[in-house]
Amino acid sequence: MTIRSGERQQQTCTPSRVLLTGGRAPITLDLARMLHRFGHRVYIAESMEQHLCRGSGVVEQCALVPSPRHQTTAYLSALEACVKRWQIDLLIPMCEEIFYVAQGAEQLRKHCRVLVSSPEQLHALHHKYDFIQLAKSMGLSVPDTYLIQNSQEQLEIQHVLIKSGEWVWKPVYSRFAAKVRMPIHQAPPGEELISRGSPWVAQRYIHGRGLCTYSVVHEGQLVAHATYESKFRTGDVGASVFFEQVEHDGAYQWVKQFVQQVAFSGQIGFDFIEESDGRVYAIECNPRATSGIHLFHPGDGLVRALFEPESLLNEKKEITPQSGDKAMLALPMLGSGIRQANSRANLRSWMTAWHRARDVVYTRQDKHPFFAQIAVVLAAWRIARAQRITLTEALTHDIEWNGEQQ
């Protein structure tokens, strides 16, 4: 049985104290609002001083903590202190700091429940080559993918790539399509960018529609799931800024088989390409929360899936958004609209999407985060300028995980 958004769920779990990490992310703000709606007390731990959840009316308190990436030990100590001080019942890592939280999960679980898988499993799923090999071993559809760790390996594989169509190049550790090199428009990375410590993959380019999924999984069983189409992005291949729920049995069955075979627990997302015949190929895995959260409304039952997955499994219920539900990040969506202006058809499509989707950041009852976006972007811009990195990279530079301590 699937619970649609029209069938509002009764919240049965006792109000709890929940600590979310990644207060800079819209998904964290959206989940915080859902939790607050059902009486839970929400706390935030964030390493950026300026973030979306700061000042939100649904958040009890925020803590500024050290960088997970650059000060891991201090970060975990600060997180444990937050858990004890606020008497947290459930800790949910929301962004890439999940890899660091996983390293300290054993200690943190002495004080509260922590929604995180093992560091080893997270690494296997995050690694863009290891994930493909794992899925391939299960007989699941994935594109041909080659691991390149040095200039010699790049040279050896060139003859295969030249004869075999178009290829996408991307770092093994990357996010939001950062540094991705698409065929035709961009050349392969130079040998100075590739090393054993910074490997890349060459992945066969598949023409088709981009689809993404978000799921909550308990011991290999789906308890919540959304599939959504990526129509508008920050760039040609950047992060999605518009999300529309679609029904897609192929993607659903792919995810269901994969999470069952790896016995996953937690939040997880996948990126797919759907060919014209409807077949889907998984190209990446994100073993953490993703933007699919935005498609769930407070009454849909996502909070219950996070708190009481066992009860949903016992009742044989699975939470999904209503087909056709739409959401967007309004400010970057405006930027995407400017890019559509050179085509009347594209602009018309964008305008239709704009008018039919809700902004996930702005609500009348909690306006502060909408205006906080300006401060967040300005802070990231200063970091980008100082470190000579892109704005997207600046937004994750202190929390991203690139295989360290493996």
What are the residue ranges of the model-derived segments?
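Glycine-/Pro-rich loop/turn segments that contact NAD(P) or position catalytic residues
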Residues: 121-145, 150, 155-162
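Glycine-rich phosphate/pyrophosphate-binding beta-alpha loops
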Residues: 177, 232-235, 240, 286-299
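Phosphate-binding site of ATP-dependent enzymes
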Residues: 184-253, 273-281
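ATP-binding N-terminal substructure of ATP-dependent carboxylate-amine bond-forming enzymes
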Residues: 1-116
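Peripheral (often C-terminal) accessory segments that flank ATP-dependent C-N-forming ligase machineries
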Residues: 304-406
